[in-house]
Amino acid sequence: DFNDGPGIDEFEKLFGHSGVEIVLGTTPDPALHLTDPHATMALQSKVGLTPTTARFYIAPQKRFFEALLDFIMVSPDLAAKAPDWRIWHPFNDPRITAIPDLADALLAASDHFPVTVDLSEVI
């Protein structure tokens, strides 16, 4: 949980990169970079299409704001094995939407949704 992300990070103003980009790796050597496909999608998006892992109610506007704040970053050797990343978002994951009790529990538990990486098939 970075509580920041691409475009909303104070470090971006100071260092020219968001905290997420810094942790993913900014060195020229890709072997030293971590991987998170959701972060990559957000960093490459030019129109604001990005996965989200958190949902906050903005009372004055009477609406919800969503952001990508939670990440699981893995090394290049694990990423090369194509593990299955998942954001347990009750509105954006049809497998969760199909189970109303699970969707309700995720909404009640936190303003952040779990992020998992299934490595069972790759290790």
Name each model feature, range by range.
Residues 3-123:
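Metal-dependent phosphoester-hydrolase catalytic domains
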